[in-house]
Amino acid sequence: MGDSHEDTSATMPEAVAEEVSLFSTTDMVLFSLIVGVLTYWFIFRKKKEEIPEFSKIQTTAPPVKESSFVEKMKKTGRNIIVFYGSQTGTAEEFANRLSKDAHRYGMRGMSADPEEYDLADLSSLPEIDKSLVVFCMATYGEGDPTDNAQDFYDWLQETDVDLTGVKFAVFGLGNKTYEHFNAMGKYVDQRLEQLGAQRIFELGLGDDDGNLEEDFITWREQFWPAVCEFFGVEATGEESSIRQYELVVHEDMDVAKVYTGEMGRLKSYENQKPPFDAKNPFLAAVTANRKLNQGTERHLMHLELDISDSKIRYESGDHVAVYPANDSALVNQIGEILGADLDVIMSLNNLDEESNKKHPFPCPTTYRTALTYYLDITNPPRTNVLYELAQYASEPSEQEHLHKMASSSGEGKELYLSWVVEARRHILAILQDYPSLRPPIDHLCELLPRLQARYYSIASSSKVHPNSVHICAVAVEYEAKSGRVNKGVATSWLRAKEPAGENGGRALVPMFVRKSQFRLPFKSTTPVIMVGPGTGIAPFMGFIQERAWLREQGKEVGETLLYYGCRRSDEDYLYREELARFHKDGALTQLNVAFSREQAHKVYVQHLLKRDREHLWKLIHEGGAHIYVCGDARNMAKDVQNTFYDIVAEFGPMEHTQAVDYVKKLMTKGRYSLDVWS
């Protein structure tokens, strides 16, 4: 934009000079004034752009898109392409499994990131015989596309391309506890058909609140027979184990060329360069880490990350993502049980030279680094991992057990659900429980999924804390059905991060900020109703700080109501002193706290909402209030929403169905916002 402004202001006086003889002296004067005003305006606007007054999240330039995925498919003899919209890696994993399946049917597949290609090329796909495009699309947050599928989503909304002749199928990944279950998968499936593409198999809807793996397997085992029937092909054999990567051990590697945990650019942690994002996180120093609650049953914590000199900007309601590290004790045990030297420098290189994904994680590196920073070793492995590992079990009964759990039989699915998923058995536990299962460590590293960033609602306002990001979290620790004690990867890791001490050592956290739609109203006079039990209070600490700051600036601020819930006042009442101070100062108009275990009958936030229903209705209907809900999606968010249905129905007054529509319209208008998790 800046270049175009400079070009315009430079050429305009010349154009005026050519025509000036056609006008009177008065006209010339007027033109001179106009030119002067325009020139000044352009220069002034240019200066304002160089120093924006609004906060904007820094993002990297979009990746360079390859010229044509269709041409690449032709060149490499592929006829199936599986695009994935993935935020946590699961959709990408499913896409890889589908593309790998293709060889069983005499077809060749490839998985692809839609961010790397121009999807307008879809119209050329019918040029390839028996071609098929599959989309594994996750839904993020409240019905949004994942980051890497945003451009594809925008293109689908705007395009009118004719996709006649394109054959497609869609598998969506979602969670039924969310309002917009599988919105992205449903939209892609519907929109492709509207553009003329032909669906060859029904839309699959995976539910992460249930058993996503089983949903995918059930869809997949019906999908391939449908593909065979449509294209007139037959399966060429049973599912087989085919290595995707080959191991290369580096005997004399320069350590300066070895990855030590970086997510993108080699040595990026030693030489930090903005902008910072998922592929280039900022190493933030921990400046505060304190326990928020009393007692020993749980550990709720408040952390502060220093973002000085990072140029990172955030708004109240945004999310901070952190890249955690696995427990070194677990990593060492895996190395010991497999008899592996974890400090060997190695690379896993893709056997498919045409693939964009050259390595499963940054290489060259060591097994120790891979298992610590790059691979997920604490979540239950998926069935395809068990299938691949089974070949390394020397005891027939153990091999049979693994094969059964990886099968699509009803008995196998039940066994996998109970023994792996519900028992929360991670890879180390499986290796411990199967003494004869000893896979090569390089193949295990190939099979394990990537360790993903963890997202937290930011618990601060940049107006008050421009150089720090605050996190409120609970350390996850529980006894699994297997009898083992499992701990949350990120929260256990964060809990151990001590602020800089006298010795000058700094605890660092790789992080970046992700923009959110969870925003305070544009007008400060708009009332806000905040509902957030437990750590759901996090974004509201930022909201309240910002409303208090606005008051200090002399701005008129509307009513600010908080409905907070915890167990007991003397146990887990988070930010008690801060909230009391905000209430006393008037920044927080109402502080309503529900204690669920302090009396004989349990009191939850929805009970307090019901108590105040008449005032809440006035704020919503007459005051244009915005409602914000943060916390548990499975129970709390639904109960709160049902309470608002009841309030609207009572004071509308209107039928329940009309009340539901009323609240849904509030959501559409951005007046009822959710920041929830399951």
Swiss-Prot record:
Enzymatic reactions: 2 oxidized [cytochrome P450] + NADPH = 2 reduced [cytochrome P450] + NADP(+) + H(+)
GO CC terms, sorted: cytosol; endoplasmic reticulum membrane; intracellular membrane-bounded organelle
Keyword Oxidoreductase in annotation: yes
Segments forming domain Flavodoxin-like: 80-224
GO BP terms: carnitine metabolic process; cellular response to follicle-stimulating hormone stimulus; cellular response to gonadotropin stimulus; cellular response to peptide hormone stimulus; demethylation; electron transport chain; fatty acid oxidation; flavonoid metabolic process
Binding-site residues, NADP(+): 298, 535, 596-597, 602-606, 639
Chain positions recorded as FMN binding sites: 86-91, 138-141, 173-182, 208
Location in or out of the cell: Endoplasmic reticulum membrane
Cofactor remark from the record: Binds 1 FAD per monomer.
CDD domains tied to this protein: CYPOR
Residues annotated as binding FAD: 424, 454-457, 472-474, 478, 488-491, 677
Residue intervals on the Cytoplasmic side: 44-678
Every FAD-binding FR-type domain range: 279-521
First-listed, main subcellular location of the protein, grouped into a coarse class: endoplasmic reticulum
Lumenal side stretches: 2-22
Residues found modified as N-acetylglycine: 2
PANTHER family tied to this protein: NADPH--CYTOCHROME P450 REDUCTASE, NITRIC OXIDE SYNTHASE-RELATED
Job description of the protein: This enzyme is required for electron transfer from NADP to cytochrome P450 in microsomes. It can also provide electron transfer to heme oxygenase and cytochrome B5.
Name of the molecule in the record: NADPH--cytochrome P450 reductase
Originating organism: Rattus norvegicus
